[in-house]
Swiss-Prot record:
PANTHER family: UPF0538 FAMILY MEMBER, UPF0538 PROTEIN C2ORF76. This is UPF0538 protein C2orf76 homolog. Belongs to the UPF0538 family. It comes from the Eukaryota. InterPro entries: UPF0538.
Length: 126
C-alpha cells in the first residue's frame, strides 16, 4: 500500500489569550502515521524553523486539534474553537487518517494545559 500524502497547515498556538499563533504548511505528510509520530516530527521540526520567532519555536506544544477541514464550515473563533473536543482533539494512538485528517486540513498545535485554562475562562487580553 502506497503511503497517502497530504498538505496540512499546522497552526502553532503560543497564547490563546493574546491570540499569538502562526501557521506553518507541511507538504507530503503521511496520513498513515500515528498522531504521536506526527507530534514527535513537529517537536523536532518547529525548533529548526528559523522563520519562526523564538517564542513560537521554543514552546511546549503537546496537543493537536482539527481546526478546519477542506470544504467544511469554519469556526468563528479567531484562535481555536472550544467545542467538539471529543471528535476534534487527535488521540495519539490513532493514525492521522483515522482521526479525520485529510489533505488541506488545518490543525492546531498547542499546550494542552494552556487550552484547558483558556477553555475554563475564555477571555482575550485585547
Amino acid at each position: 500500500m502506497a503511503a497517502e500524502e497530504a498538505t496540512l497547515t499546522v497552526r502553532l498556538i503560543r497564547s490563546f489569550e493574546h491570540r499569538n499563533f502562526k501557521p506553518v504548511v507541511y507538504h507530503g505528510v503521511n496520513l498513515h502515521q500515528t498522531v504521536k509520530e506526527f507530534i514527535i516530527f513537529l517537536k523536532q521540526d518547529v525548533p529548526l524553523r528559523t522563520s519562526l520567532p523564538p517564542p513560537l519555536r521554543n514552546y511546549k506544544y503537546d496537543t493537536l486539534k482539527i481546526l478546519h477541514q477542506a470544504h467544511k464550515a469554519k469556526t468563528n473563533e479567531l484562535v481555536l474553537g472550544l467545542e467538539d473536543d471529543d471528535t476534534l482533539l487527535l488521540k495519539e494512538d490513532r493514525t492521522l487518517k483515522d482521526s479525520g485528517v485529510a489533505s488541506e486540513t488545518e490543525i492546531a498545535f498547542f499546550c494542552g494545559e494552556d487550552y484547558k485554562r483558556y477553555k475554563a475562562n475564555p477571555i482575550s487580553s485585547w
